[in-house]
Amino acid sequence: MSRLPIELIEIQFIHACNLSCQGCATFSEIKHSGYSTWQQIETQLEPWLHRLEPESIGLMGGEPFMNPRLEQVIMGIRERLPNTQIRLPTNGLLLLKKYRIVEMLKEIGNVTLKISYHLDDPLINKAIKKIMNDFEFRPVTEYGINRWLADNEFRFQINRPTTFMKSFRDDYADMKPHNNTPTDAFEICVAKRCPFLFEGKLFKCSTAGLTPWILERFDNPNSDLWEPYLNAGLSPDCSDHELEKFLRNFGKPHAICRQCPSKYDQDSLLDHRKLVTKK
C-alpha cells in the first residue's frame, strides 16, 4: 500500500515547562525533567513514515524552547521531510534569549511559529514586537486561523486562550475520567485534528496518549475506571484496515473522547487567565 496522507502528527519532545497552567493538555503544569533528541524522535517517527505522509509535524511541549536540542530536532525533521510544514508552539518567554532559532525557522521555511499568549509579560511582548519588525509579514487567514505570512512560507501566529479544559476529575492523586458521551466531549475539544505520536504509538490526541503515562506516575489511581481508556495507541505494525480506520476518524468523535469534559462540566472548564504562574 502506498503512503497515506495525514494532515498532522504532533510529537511530544519535552514535558518540562517554565509555566504552570492548570488544565494543561500535556500535563506540563507539574514538574518534569528530561527531553528528547532528534535520534530518539527519528526512532519513533521513521516506522510511520513508511506508511504515512504528514502534511505537518508539530513539536509539542512543555515548552519546546527549553529543549537544548531544539535546533537539531528542527533540522532533522527538515532534512528527513523537506516538504512537510513544521509547527512550533511556544509561550514566548525564551524567544529573545534563543532568537537565533527564530531566524533559523525563517531561513528553512515552511514553518509556523505559534505563541500561546498565557501571560502579559515584557519578555513575550518584546519578542512579538521584534518578530513583527524583523520580517515583512502580510495578514492571512488559513483554515479559519488568523496568521502573518512572510516569504519562504514562514508563518507567525498568536493564540490567546481564555479557557483550559481539565481532562480529568479531582486531583492527580485521585484522577477520574469524566465519562461523557463522545459527541458532547468532542464538541468543545481543542484538539479535534491533532494526532499524537508518543512512545512510538499514534494516538487520537495528546490526552489519549499521555493519560496512561501520567496515571502510572501517580501509581494508577482508580485503575478500574480508567481501564476503557488505556491501550488506545496504534502501533506502526498495525494492519492496513486499522490504519485506514484511524485516518477516517480524523476530526470526528471517538469512544476515547468520553474521558474528557463537556460543556456541562463547569468545574473542569478553567479560567486560564487566573490559573497560570511562572515556575
Report each predicted region and the residues it spans:
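Accessory C-terminal segments flanking Radical SAM cores
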Residues: 169-279
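Conserved alpha-helical substructure of the radical SAM core
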Residues: 1-90, 95-100
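Soluble or luminal CAZymes and related metallo-dependent hydrolases
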Residues: 5, 36-40, 69, 123, ...
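Conserved AdoMet/S-adenosylmethionine-binding subsite of the radical SAM
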Residues: 67-199, 204-208, 213
